Amino acid sequence: MQFTKWFIALPLAVTALSGCSLLERLVYRIDINQGNYVDQQSVDQLKFGMSKDQVRFVLGSPMLVENGYPDTWYYIYHHTQGHNDPVQKNLIVKFNDGGKLVNVAGDFPAGDSFFEGVN
């Protein structure tokens, strides 16, 4: 009788203590993409002096434009693939008071031809 109690209690205790963490990898998780997908090829198309409409045409609408700083646009992309750690990429685009592109910062460097300007 004593053996039967241990035979039932031990597996239950091990399962409760592990919290099913061993089985977590067996459960399928979908890939989650959120925000504005931006790649280096798109950033390379940006030129110094582009208008806001031209930048919006190349990159799409920004994820965030702060109320107090309408000349700074934020493009944020967040990707979680299955059980892997999430990856976040940021691109910050700044305009001058006239609405012309003056700076690109973040995880993507400006292209080599950025300072050639718009023709």
Curated annotation (Swiss-Prot):
- The lipid of kind N-palmitoyl cysteine is covalently joined to 20
| Any Pfam family the entry gives | BamE
Q: Where is the lipid attached (S-diacylglycerol cysteine)?
A: 20
Q: What would be an example GO MF term here? A: protein-macromolecule adaptor activity
Identify one Gene Ontology CC term for this UniProt entry.
Bam protein complex
Alphabetical list of PROSITE patterns matching this protein: PROKAR_LIPOPROTEIN
Known role = Part of the outer membrane protein assembly complex, which is involved in assembly and insertion of beta-barrel proteins into the outer membrane.
Q: What is this protein called?
A: Outer membrane protein assembly factor BamE
Species in which this protein is naturally found: Vibrio cholerae serotype O1 (strain ATCC 39315 / El Tor Inaba N16961)
Q: Which gene encodes it?
A: bamE
